[in-house]
């Protein structure tokens, strides 16, 4: 992002307004999952842009997706087997392994990760980017998305849906997110503002299914929010 393309005048105006009008909020410690106004704004955005009918209380905010990945490993468990896409985001494998979790890289086909490949290994959690796979750009069709949801619903499994780069399209609207069509509370949705605003703005978020959010509040409420 070039400096001349960033709306610094608008950014400065909003900062001045916030400092002037939200002084008490700025001096109040954020809850573990993040400040309520930001979570509400994200919920409104996802409802409008991604058709996700969610509560702000399901949203967890963190300083970068790497931090949120580590939270998920703490929440779901280091004893689980995590599968990632091959090819894919190389840093993911290191994050899982450095946090003591078993990570398997599964080859993808022309529609993304397949249930056929998943059935060849023992796997508890898959981590995928169905709306814009990196580095191939593959978009997982709706039929494959339902197959993956069926896989997750068949056992104690989860899908981590990284909705990377979905804001940028030449025409039309994106295919519905896995989270928005999931009926079994098995999808964890993740996104970040580093692409839509700037890479130096380290604000990312995840949306947890309600049962998993309850577990998050019980297990990880001692942590401080990394975004203030």
Give the residues covered by each predicted segment.
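Short catalytic/ligand-binding loop motif for oxyanion handling, primarily in non-cytosolic enzymes
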Residues: 3-7, 134-136, 167-168, 199
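Conserved N-terminal helix/loop that builds the PLP phosphate-binding region
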Residues: 1-22
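Short glycine/proline-enriched turns and hinge-like loops at secondary-structure junctions
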Residues: 7-8, 170-172, 181, 199-201, ...
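Short, histidine-centered active-site or binding-site loop motifs used for metal coordination
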Residues: 1, 129-132, 194, 220
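Walker B catalytic acidic pair
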Residues: 162-163
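Conserved core of the PLP fold type I
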Residues: 15-156, 166-168, 173-181, 188
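PLP-dependent aminotransferase class I/II
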Residues: 188-228
